[in-house]
Amino acid sequence: MAGFPLLLTLLTHCAGSWAQSVLTQPPSASGTPGQRVTISCSGSSSNIGSNYVYWYQQLPGTAPKLLIYSNNQRPSGVPDRFSGSKSGTSASLAISGLRSEDEADYYCAAWDDSLSG
């Protein structure tokens, strides 16, 4: 079966008229149906290291949907094929039993303490 891309985008935190990218994701990941794919998100002690991580899925032409909150919790209705984890200043989203409908943009998010005040 042919592989298909899971497109990833950097999350940008905005404040006022400026924006700063503080979390880093790889530009893309791919897999074949049925596989397990892991998407990474790297940060620092001021964001992932000291705050909860959230993951969003954005299908083409739709608004972002919350997949994971508080590092590893799934909202009602999100399949258990999706799981989140965090270790130190990095987080990851795992998708098991990959399906064609999983092709989307995936965003990680975390508050950054350095942007406060």
Curated annotation (Swiss-Prot):
GO terms for cellular component: blood microparticle; extracellular region; immunoglobulin complex; plasma membrane. The keyword Nucleus does not apply. GO terms for biological process: adaptive immune response; immune response. It comes from the Eukaryota. InterPro entries: Ig-like_dom (IPR007110), Ig-like_dom_sf (IPR036179), Ig-like_fold (IPR013783), Ig_sub (IPR003599), Ig_V-set (IPR013106), IgV_Light_Chain (IPR050150). Residues 20-117 form the Ig-like domain. This is Immunoglobulin lambda variable 1-47. Disulfide bonds join 41-108.
